[in-house]
Amino acid sequence: MAFIDDLEEYSKRHTQKPALISADTGTRLSYGELYNMSGKVYSYLKEHGIGREKVVMICATRGVRPFVVLLGVWRAGAAAVIVETDFAKERMNYIYEDSGSVLFIDDNVFMEMMDYPSQIGHEPTDPHDLALLVYTSGTTGKPKGVLQEYGILEMGIKGNVYEDHHVMEESDRLALTTPLNFTATILMTVPTLHEGGTIVVFSRDVAKNPQLFKKYIEEYHISILFMTSMMINLMKNMLTSVKKIITGGELVKNVYIDGIDIYCIYSQSEACFHLCALKIDKEYEVTPIGKPCVESA
């Protein structure tokens, strides 16, 4: 699995480079710590016979923990479905049963995992093995799940290339504001980690507090984030230190900020990687979805 192999090599070369930061708690994990801790998750899952085509549900507190677990799950060759801790119990139970999950990983299980020795390497996987399940909100009925294969990880990395450059780069600090179960979260975090960038996880309430949002953007030196076009227009005066914005998920219209590279990304839950992209050069009443991403569509 190229993504995991590349991440392992990067972690060895840049052991102290920040990989994950929780903006709320200030918890920081370096690439070396992330790889070591995910190896403990891998070790736990391997001992419990959880590997290829087995699904686990991740429900750890929003911050660094869900990503430690997710990486460990992928190193074990298993699959994950992520839910937020504030999900309604009925919805959570339904997703657990519908996904066929064999393990529920909350903060207590996470702490148990951290007592295990760290396993090196990873299990072999096929690009068509199950890696992730993404569920809809269920506002029109029961949540519906989409199965994602390991191949999407490599496609997501290839889709990070726009024309002749990478959108997410090693120097970037990504503000993660999206729900953990959203496709956009995978679209943003996998390329960021692959390139050696830093992910700063914001609480879901931060975007509702403009002053706190601005404070976090400046305090954590955020250079890139995902926002809908509506949020961009509402908060454009607070984004002066941001260099790049990824937008999508709804109709993109009348979006342009001089001095900030804004990329309109077209994707789907069924794909979970960038299909088309456009670097916005002016305001459009209806922004084009752009051209197919290099090697991904």
Feature annotation, model-predicted:
Residues 94, 102-103, 173, 223-224, ...:
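Short, Asp-centered acidic motifs that coordinate Mg2+ and/or phosphate
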Residues 78, 197, 240-243, 258-261:
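A short helix->loop->beta-strand "cap" motif at the edges of active sites that frequently abuts
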Residues 144-173, 179-223:
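Conserved AMP-binding/adenylation subdomain of ANL enzymes
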Residues 1-151, 165-167:
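Carrier-protein-dependent adenylate-forming modules in NRPS/ANL systems
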Residues 61, 178-181, 205-206, 220-254, ...:
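Adenylate-forming
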Residues 24, 60-64, 78-96, 197-222, ...:
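ATP-dependent adenylate-forming carboxylate-activation enzymes
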Residues 39, 113-137, 142-158, 244-254, ...:
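Adenylate-forming AMP-binding core of the ANL superfamily, especially NRPS adenylation
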Residues 60-71, 86-90, 177-195, 207-211, ...:
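Conserved coil-to-alpha-helix start sites within the AMP-binding
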